[in-house]
Amino acid sequence: MIADAFLWILNRTPSLRRALWRALFDLLAMRFRHIGWWTLMNYGYAEPGQADTSFDLQEADEPERYPIALYRHVAMLAPMTGRDVLEVGSGRGGGASYIARYIKPRRMVGLDLSGKAVAFSSKRHGMANLHFQQGDAEQLPFADESFDSVINVESSFCYPSIDRFFAEVRRVLRPGGHLHYTDLRLAHEVEAWRQAIARSGLELIAERDITPNVVEALHRDSPRRREGGRRIAGAWAGLADVFTGVDGTRIPSLLAGGGMAYYSFLLRKPPVSAPVSAPVSAYAAG
């Protein structure tokens, strides 16, 4: 009920959305700053019918295989190796760390609205090609055409204006650069989401409904999520179950029942700058 009330407030007061999410993630980062094993908060990705070991991970990364798999799925939509990459909404830094260590961009920057999350990430993930800083997804603190790739994982639903986010991504991408993008929406919000993508001035290169993959990941990962919630939340473990998407709670039920959908997209800034109203070319990727 508490989680539902929080989401109800967010949906009806977009002007408060940024402040409420920042307060929540500041609280999480401060309360759990000593818990180094929890570095990713997304719902994960798994291929139904495939073994959990379908790609290699270092032993230390294995517990977060499913959230890492979501980053891997989105990151592999276009090359990142040797490129300048920005993650908008880097959270506790685990996704940016995975990309920096496994995919090896020239430069990896993780940006998050929560200063406390940035402090945690900077302390937890130390690498020469990885840097974290605080900033707003709708006012990216970077010069025009600073990055070859931008990645955004399960974060944009928090933003007051998705249009401003897309405009900022378009601004900081170099011509021909990619936005690797994945998120979820309630079923009745999907059409408006598609319209926002269509008017972004970014070309839609690939799109995939990964709802079954996220449902599968949440099912497989529920024992870890449930156990982690009891370790860190104690008497509030039930609320932690809702927040982390344990089987039987609201988000997995909506996803499995068709009330919510989860998509991944690859978008591209036109190789030669074009007006925002330029037509969008698209094809579906299976």
Model-predicted segments: where are they?
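Conserved alpha-helix/loop element of class I SAM-dependent methyltransferases that forms part
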Residues: 64-81
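A short acidic, Gly/Pro-enriched loop at the edge of an enzyme's catalytic core
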Residues: 138-150
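A short glycine-rich, Lys/Arg-flanked "PGG" loop and its adjoining helix->strand segment in the class I
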Residues: 163-175
